């Protein structure tokens, strides 16, 4: 029995048993968006998914869509050993502080494993995420990876970009961020994260007052309320 009014039968010894017997079935794609949201938002369910992904027993083939290992292996003609070998081969490419499959795609796109999984960038990213020691920041239709969670945030990633390439306009940092990591941010999200972190002047060449004025001119919302919004 769990909070939020959700329970599984006592015939199951664990959430993992319930997950495998009742949810992620052989030959089917488990889509979180189509499930009872009371279930998919349970911390126990999320924890179970994460553990099974780390053990390479289930795979995320698209955002919040999962299949069992057997399904992936049969559909793509790969083995568990192929997945582990891919992780071992790709790890040396993950030398930047921040990375994901998109940021190294030019280097891996012609690998046999990548072609066998039909160049599924999301799947490759989720497999890379499960390399020991890597943590993830889910954002804007993708997720960014790092071996250090201490500075894994949008402002620090922007600072990392400008440390290498110099300060930029808000439009340019938004474009560069999306280009490197395959994200879909609009500039208002980047702006709010930089403003609230106090790192605007370290990264952006535009004056922050001018940006706030432009919001006031183009929005029917209260500016303070808009800037206080939590996006993630």
Put a short name on every predicted segment.
Residues 1-232:
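C-terminal non-catalytic scaffold/interaction domains in large multidomain proteins
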């Amino acid at each position: 029995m769990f909070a939020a009014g959700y329970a599984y039968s006592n015939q199951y010894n664990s959430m993992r048993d319930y997950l495998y017997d009742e949810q992620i079935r052989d030959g089917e794609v488990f889509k979180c968006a189509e499930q009872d949201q009371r279930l998919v938002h349970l911390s126990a369910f999320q924890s179970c998914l994460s553990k099974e992904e780390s053990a390479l027993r289930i795979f995320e083939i698209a955002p919040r869509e999962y299949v069992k290992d057997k399904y992936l292996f049969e559909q793509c003609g790969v083995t568990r050993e192929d997945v582990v070998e891919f992780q071992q081969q790709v790890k040396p490419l993950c030398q930047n502080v921040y990375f994901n499959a998109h940021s190294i795609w030019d280097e891996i796109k012609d690998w046999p494993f990548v072609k066998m999984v039909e160049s599924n960038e999301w799947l490759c990213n989720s497999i890379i995420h499960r390399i020991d020691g890597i943590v993830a920041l889910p954002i804007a239709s993708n997720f960014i990876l790092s071996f250090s969670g201490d500075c894994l945030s949008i402002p620090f990633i922007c600072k990392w970009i400008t440390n290498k390439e110099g300060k930029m306009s808000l439009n340019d940092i938004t474009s560069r961020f999306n280009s490197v990591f395959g994200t879909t941010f609009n500039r208002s999200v980047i702006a709010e994260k930089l403003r609230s972190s106090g790192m605007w002047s370290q990264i952006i060449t535009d004056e922050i007052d001018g940006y706030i004025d432009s919001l006031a001119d183009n929005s029917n919302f209260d500016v303070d309320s808009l800037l206080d919004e939590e996006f993630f």
